[in-house]
């Protein structure tokens, strides 16, 4: 992967770790940082050797505090224009609806506005006990336009979501867990170990099965009738799984009492 200035990308076997690297400004994002993150997730999506991703923030204070409002204000004063997010959305992830590989958000501090929207776009959200979440855009004359309004209202009860969004209030990691948008809360020092543990458990499964599962779940959310959703399994990732080497290897390894050797094809 190309060298980056505002993010760090590490590869550990089948695992990609993406770190937002602007701790001096609470990992807020401007167009250049957004583009770097988008490039990283483009590579993740395209690389058949990468099966799971973790996204986190540098430092101990912030996962991502959203847009770099100082940059936005300066640009608008100079040009009259607002910065645009990349086509795949804030952080290169918020509008990436075609990504069938799993993403884990390891939230190490504040996740505000667009930062919270990145975390909501992940499949699993592991939070440090120091993490805090909010969609505070109405407090500065904006709205959570990178998927926060739509995702939060789908991931937790509507009245609780509205209570957060209409006030812009901050929510602790523990309350986020109780509401249901946080998968697990751990002591701050254990955050990355916990995220790696979850990634390791996913990597024990067939990547073909994981992609099929994610694709069916996410696309079925748009089907109002359960019976119709259950009948419709003609999704590309599900069909690919049924025709894969992995679907033969899994039962064979089970019968032979050994770990399966997944090929991802």
Task: Go through the PLM ranges and name each one.
Residues 1-60:
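Conserved CoA-thioester-binding segment of acyl-CoA-metabolizing enzymes
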Residues 1-16, 48, 60, 71, ...:
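C-terminal alpha-helix plus adjacent terminal tail
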Residues 18, 22, 36-37, 55, ...:
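Terminal peptide-recognition signature
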Residues 23-26, 60-61, 66, 130-132, ...:
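A short, glycine- and basic residue-enriched loop/turn
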Residues 35-42, 69-108, 140, 155, ...:
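An acidic, glycine-rich surface segment that forms the CoA-thioester-binding/catalytic face
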Residues 59-61, 109-110:
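Short glycine-rich anion-binding loops that position phosphate/pyrophosphate groups of nucleotides
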Residues 94-208, 243-244, 248-252, 258:
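Crotonase-fold acyl-CoA enzyme core
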